[in-house]
Amino acid sequence: MTYIQERGSTHVYHVNRMSKEEMDHMISLCVHEQPAYCVAACPFKADTKEMLFYAAKGNFKKALAIYEKITPFPMILCNGCTAPCEEKCRLCELGDGISIREVERAIVRYGEPGKRSSVFRIRKKKKAVIFGSGLFPLFLAGELEKKMYPATIYCQEKDYEAYIAAAAPELLESDRKNEVKRLSSMDLSFEFGCSLDLPFIRAKMKEADVVCASEEVAKKLAPEETADAEIMLREQAGIVSGPVRSVMDAAFAAKRAALTVDLLVQNLSPHSNRGSEGAVTTRLYTNMDGMKGSKKIPCSTDGYSKEEAVEEAKRCIQCHCDECMKSCIYLREYKKHPGLLAREIYNNTQIIMGDHQMNKPMNSCSLCGQCTVTCPNGFDMSQVCKSARENMVSTDKMPLAPHEFALMDMLFSNSEAFLCRPQPGYETCRYVFFPGCQAGAIAPDVVTEAYEDLCRRTEGGVALMLGCCGAISEWAGRYEMTEKVNEQLKQELAKLGDPMIIAGCPSCMKQLKESLGAKVTGIWEILKEIGLPGQAKGLEIPVAIHDACGARGDTQTQDTIRELLADMGCTVVNTEYSRDLSPCCGYGGLTAYANKEMADKMTEKCLERSDSPYITYCMACRDRFVREGRESRHILELLYGINAANMPDISEKRYNRLELKEKLLKNIWNEELMMEKKDYTVAYTEDAISMMDERMILKSDVERVLDRK
């Protein structure tokens, strides 16, 4: 048997199997980090979802801290907020949406303002002046103070309270006092009682780098010009000003104006680098199936009490997308959404020297493709992980250890255990039966019965090919090995006249189609056409079908399996996550070799769906279910009336392949194959066999050591 030569880790091939642009495009498909519908509708991008989360827990201090991020004066903003977020609440589809505005008011009323930290707050050198009073100058003063601009406000009012009253006269006295306290604590300079005539204003303008003003003052300074609504700037006069309209308009205009100030002091165009301002459209997907509507908590004219606000906030369903994570053990175990995990895996491939800490997560994906079906945008984590594995292999950064045993097993199947023969009496054949390496390892008698049946009941000759389709090396990212397997199979098929392949495994069927471009059908399709074997018999109790990963998207195969079971008299129990939504058993993608614990959890997840016996059409699935103590049969076992051995260990699997080859050569082609016989026997305890199976130590490994003595 050929052994795998691992290249030295000091030699690096600069090959990328997936570019950064391709990765960025893939990551953009994941909408997990897209803003919730209410957040996207808010022009200030207030994290309403997070606020409601903390309000529902009664943590009004944390909720207020989130609200304070979007405005320097929360009392004024929440009183004048028109709540565009409320109509976007998904609960509106089922009944009453969340009373977000009233909950926000309760948060501001009952929340404790956070302490202003002076750490890392370095005052900027450029100075700003603000002339006048009203909503826009007030909000702008607060925004500039957040950005640490030394700002001086010149106004006609006599004190802070009058300044607040001029901007928001509708505030209750208690609320006004709170905002006065907030304003007076800011690092701003106020000049109260100013005349604000033109000579005074022009004199003060000379002392500043940036001039801001209320609309009233701006009209005095530049009566012929109006401010650009996008940047809040009278460009010819160089005056930043805003509208005298609603609270929402003034607060939003102040944010735009503050950004304009930032750009002006850096000598940049105020039209550039503005990012996304205002409300946005979200691509978030939230599955509302199973959600129930509810009535909003009634609100008095005084607003919600603390308790009422908590109850109303609890109605929030915290819109998010986790469709892929609901059913994928891999994503749930790593507690990361696909976009983030894909980014970390991609970054892992770019490390030249140092620890590759994402190797195990990269190798733990079963490459089953379930996420492409559950994701509303078809995010394919299997493509990310497979490309990353290939990239790591191509750059000599992928250790052989996680996949070595599986790769050695593939080489064994395609060398010592390999067999390719035409049906006796034929030189070329119409068909070739390719049962797959797992079928020969787990249920060799089924392979024999199936082949003999096909020879008897089909015309044109049926050849037999025992070996591996190359899925093992494909999953491992060892593309060079896959190419060698493809070349070997192509040569053997050519000798047979390039017949149609009858696959006994959906993964083989998929691999052979994609890698060889060959004509492939499933044995189930042939049996549906020629009829059931005489010994076919279903189980007398209800059964559950586990659809193989290789059949994802293959409706014809899924339907045919169900039709054959019905023809055998089986009663099939419908299960959650079946057909294209079916999860992986834990063998796919070589997860069982790279991360056994993860694979075991995948198997358990599969078995949670039903207590009935499982019928599979993938031998690896059948093997893993039996090992978990669940009665499980491959459909070919029912079709040919054979119940294969329950749990062959890794050594028995290899022996079964060799014995199958020997028996078929002898009984069908009258050829003798002498299997090597040792002049000694080794006895193993059950504990030893279990330990060897766990550590993937073959009996032949033990014998090889003994032979050296």
Report each predicted region and the residues it spans:
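Ferredoxin-type iron-sulfur electron-transfer modules and their immediate structural context
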Residues: 1-120, 181, 188, 213-364
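Short, flexible hinge/linker loops that cap or flank conserved catalytic cores
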Residues: 32, 120-123, 232, 425, ...
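Iron-sulfur-cluster electron-transfer modules
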Residues: 36-39, 49-209, 335-518, 657-666
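Active-site proximal loops enriched in glycine and acidic residues that flank catalytic Cys/His/Asp
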Residues: 155, 215, 242-243, 330-332, ...
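Cofactor-cradling patches in redox/metallo enzymes
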Residues: 166-174, 438-524, 550-663
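Short glycine-/small-residue-rich Rossmann-like dinucleotide-binding loops
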Residues: 215-217, 376, 506, 619
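A conserved helix-loop-strand patch within extracytoplasmic ligand-binding domains
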Residues: 520-544
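Ribonuclease/tRNase effector modules and their secretory precursors
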Residues: 649, 654-709
